[in-house]
Every structure is written in structure tokens, then in C-alpha cells.
């Protein structure tokens, strides 16, 4: 069973990987494995150099972003607009594969602007497949590069999940993962049972990370005994070990555990304490533990 956490770095960070603070950009804790590094770019040599540098940090997968529709990303010539240049994507994939024995994967949309017929995405996948890629993460919406914000691009273009199933049928020896508005583990299981090799869950897991505690039980019938409080203890230990005196980092980590208490009485107080500047400064690495005690009276 592989549950991948993904760390995404865009074109600016690609350049910073080569020239900047690599430990800050690429470092992570060993318990986070397996971790995939998502890169954005369209220059095969730069991407290969980024992968070569990142390999020292022990990433388990390298993913090329061919799905982001933002204007900033388009100006950098990467993201969803790369689907219009499949040969460039193929060259990037080959260059990345040449410097690593880890999987090089591609995340993409099912179309771009008016190119929304099945043949377009089938040919894109076929070209990248011929370059050696065998793992595709399919966001089952088209990307509209003009007139929509990234948020609107996650909501307005219609969801066409059948496209991912057609791709799996046409490329049966690939690992095909489906992405896009998967809101629950039951929904994820239904997609796997229907023939997908896996799913990528994004926003639903971010907004309610506790849903991930049920993955083993729902997908594999294996019960778990993890509690939210245990997660709080682990996150506190993580902050103590890595960011004891780094208020900026503590604030960032706290922001990303907001959803742990979603649906619980006291969740509002939990969020208030986590975002309180005075609490962040005074409690430091003990902030998350303190917030839980304030909201739920246990610790």
C-alpha cells in the first residue's frame, strides 16, 4: 500500500533548487515517506539537474506538472499549457529518467481550452508513454487557460471521469490514478473498484486530514487505532525536533493542521488558538498541544 505525500515546486523553485537554499526547499522528515516531488518546467536539462540535486534527499517519485492552469505558470511555459507540446513533455520525462531510478510520473488534465476531445488527451498520453512514463495522474477536467482563475478551473470545467477509464483501457499496463473532486474515502474506493489503479485526493484531505486515518479500513479492511490526540502529540514532537525556535515555520505548520478538528465541537476555538499571534510566540513548538488543550480540555 503506497500513500504518497506530494511536495510541489514551481518554476521559480526549480531555479532555486539549482541555485538556492536546497535544504529549505527539499528537506523533509523520514516518517513522511513515501514523498513525491512535483516539478514545473519545460527545459529538459534544468529538470534533469533538479532531479539530480533532489535525489540526495531521498524522494520516492518525481512528478512533472502538466495540469496547473494559472497565468503565472503559463508565463513560465509549464503546467497545463505543456499538454499542447507533448514532444516537449516527452523530452522532459526522458531527461528526468536519465538521472534517477525512481519513477518519473506526469499529472495532467483531460484537455486544454478547445482541445477537449478524447483523441487529444489519448495522443498526449501516448507520446509521453512512448518516452517511458508509466504512471499518469489524471485530473478529469479540462484546463481553460483564458478567463478562469485556478480556483474556477477546479470547479467550472465539467468533470468527465469516464476519460480516465478510457485511458486505462487504451494503456492497460500503465498505473492510472484519477484526481478531481474526490470528496470521501467511499468515493475513492468506488473508483478503485471500478478499475482505477489509485486516486489522488487533494482538497478534501487538506480540509479534513482526519479522513486519511480511515484509508486502511475503507480500502483494505484493516482497522486503525490512531487518535486525533496522538496526531497532536506527533506534530508537537515534529515541531520540537525541527522548528523549536522558528516562529515563521511554526505558524506555517499550524495553519496546515487547522482541519484536524473539523466537525468537532470546539473546532472554532482550536482554529482561533492556532492562528493567534500571541499564542504562536508564547507557546512556540508547544502551540498545537496548547491549542488542543484549550479547545478540548485534554492533552
Language-model segments: which ranges?
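Short, structured active-site "lid" loops
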Residues: 23-38
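Hydrophobic faces of well-ordered beta-strands that scaffold small-molecule active sites
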Residues: 7, 35-39, 62, 104-108, ...
Amino acid at each position: 500500500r503506497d500513500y504518497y505525500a506530494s511536495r510541489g515546486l514551481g518554476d521559480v523553485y526549480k531555479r532555486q533548487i539549482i541555485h538556492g537554499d536546497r535544504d529549505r526547499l527539499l528537506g523533509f522528515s523520514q516518517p513522511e515517506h513515501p514523498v513525491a516531488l512535483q516539478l514545473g518546467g519545460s527545459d529538459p536539462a534544468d529538470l534533469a539537474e533538479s532531479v539530480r540535486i533532489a535525489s540526495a534527499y531521498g524522494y520516492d517519485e518525481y512528478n512533472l506538472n502538466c495540469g496547473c492552469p494559472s497565468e503565472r505558470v503559463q508565463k513560465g511555459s509549464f503546467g497545463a499549457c505543456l499538454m499542447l507540446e507533448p514532444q516537449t513533455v516527452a523530452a522532459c520525462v526522458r531527461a528526468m529518467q536519465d538521472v534517477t531510478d525512481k519513477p518519473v510520473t506526469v499529472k495532467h488534465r483531460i484537455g486544454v481550452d478547445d482541445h477537449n476531445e478524447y483523441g487529444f488527451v489519448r495522443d498526449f498520453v501516448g507520446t509521453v508513454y512512448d518516452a517511458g512514463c508509466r504512471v499518469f495522474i489524471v485530473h478529469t477536467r479540462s484546463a481553460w487557460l483564458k478567463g478562469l482563475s485556478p480556483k474556477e478551473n477546479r470547479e467550472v470545467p465539467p468533470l468527465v471521469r469516464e476519460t480516465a477509464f478510457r485511458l486505462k483501457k487504451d494503456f492497460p499496463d500503465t498505473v492510472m490514478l484519477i484526481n478531481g473532486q474526490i470528496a470521501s474515502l467511499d468515493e475513492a474506493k468506488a473508483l478503485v473498484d471500478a478499475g482505477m489503479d489509485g486516486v489522488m485526493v487533494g482538497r478534501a484531505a487538506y480540509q479534513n486530514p482526519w479522513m486519511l486515518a480511515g484509508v486502511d479500513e475503507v480500502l483494505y479492511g484493516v482497522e486503525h487505532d490512531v487518535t486525533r490526540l496522538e496526531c497532536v502529540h506527533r506534530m508537537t514532537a515534529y515541531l520540537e525536533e525541527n522548528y523549536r525556535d522558528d516562529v515563521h515555520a511554526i505558524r506555517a505548520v499550524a495553519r496546515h493542521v487547522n482541519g484536524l478538528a473539523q466537525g468537532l465541537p470546539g473546532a472554532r476555538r482550536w482554529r482561533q488558538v492556532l492562528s493567534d499571534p500571541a499564542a504562536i510566540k508564547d507557546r512556540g513548538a508547544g502551540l498545537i498541544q496548547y491549542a488542543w488543550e484549550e479547545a478540548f480540555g485534554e492533552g
